Amino acid sequence: MGFKKIGVACGVNPLPGLKIKAWLIATGSDLDMEVEVVESAQEMPLEPPTPRIALGDRKIAAFLAASELQKAGCEAVIIPDVRTEPFLPELQKELQVPVISLLAGLPESLKAEGIRRIGLLGRAVPQDFYEKIFGADFEFVKLAEDLTPIYDILQSPGEALKKHGFSPENEEMMMKAGEKLLEAGAEVLIPNCTQMARFAEELRLRGLPVIDLLRNAAVEAVKATPKRLPKPFKVGLIGGLGPAATVDLYDKIVKATPAKTDQEHIKVVVEQNPQIPDRTAALLRGGVDPTLAMFNCAKRLEDDECDAIIVPCNTAHAFLPYLQRFIRTPFINMQQAALDEIKAKLGDKARIGLLATTGTVQTGIYSDKAKAMGLAMFVPDAEHQERVMAAIYGPKGAKAGYTDGVCREDLLSAAEVLVRDGCNCLILGCTELPLILDESDDFEVAGAHMVVIDPTAALARKVVKTAEEAFERTGIH
């Protein structure tokens, strides 16, 4: 015996939802398959003040219900609402769980039966929507003007069908409408109102050739459950360390993305927390440990279903091993991205000079990786390391808003020392340093020509490459 788990957004339209539930179970029984039906009770707000707000209510309620059912592990979802049909593509774009249309498979099956002329029983959705779905092989019978008041009564919110069900008065009105459509040449009738769809069985017993949309969707969901769709790549960014570095990384991701439209850019979620304790202070002076604050950010990004997490702070990477013991989402490592680019540019001939905070230097987050890759790495002597720190933290440094003058002189003096050590490459290993020196493939220092790598830019390029690889696999931005 097989098994299927199907979700129904019953709260959007409770009674039609129950009918779909019954059809799902019955179809499973016919196919010797156990069907677990999961219901969402998400309702639409009452009494929207305008038609546009009513449409927004319907879209958002359908999305909330489908999202809930997706999280519950459903293999497919049915929204028991004819008015939802026109925006199912919008809904599906935001979800991975397949949303089964009430009209699923109908154009093909009706064409196979030789049926060409269709009448719409109700007017919840404009006729041109159906004409687009069914195509040129079908002709829809024009709505007779005298049916409009009948449909208005039957579809009245809180009255008629919704309130009184298949009463003699409602039966008479539906039969009259159906017979009019048949007289006009319709071969079959499609309920263009969810409440009318609810009574398809009763109308068929009275001789009207009404297609049972609720049964149709249930059968399609069980017999031909589509595969869950891949989701677009989404990167999570632990922001706030520092705020300007967060903006810088995001800006570099945008600039590195080869997009021609807004829609081709990468989904980015920023968990901005400037209150994360200072990483350098924690490493060098016994300051407050930032591990929990960083973990909380990473967990939120993981819960938001990010595919990768990035951190726009070199020193913060020293704390990632603690997070990675609990966070399943992979981190794209800034130092590794920078070193991979250097290896690609210079190979084993690379002699790397590291310009970074003393905390970053002491943690070995660069040197340990460089050693594992067989790359030589050097740092300034103590005197010039102090000048690097002054370029970052000093009263005329980058964190104080300066990008030229004393801070640049301090940084270049440290770079000159590294040139004397034979370095042919510099890593700007603090997010403030690219504000002072630009990334370059040919930067002259003390008569030597060097490659200068901005790890933030390298990380941005790695994010874009990872996103492009995901797009090649899924075809989804």
Model-derived features: positions:
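Non-catalytic structural scaffold of enzyme domains
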Residues: 1-477
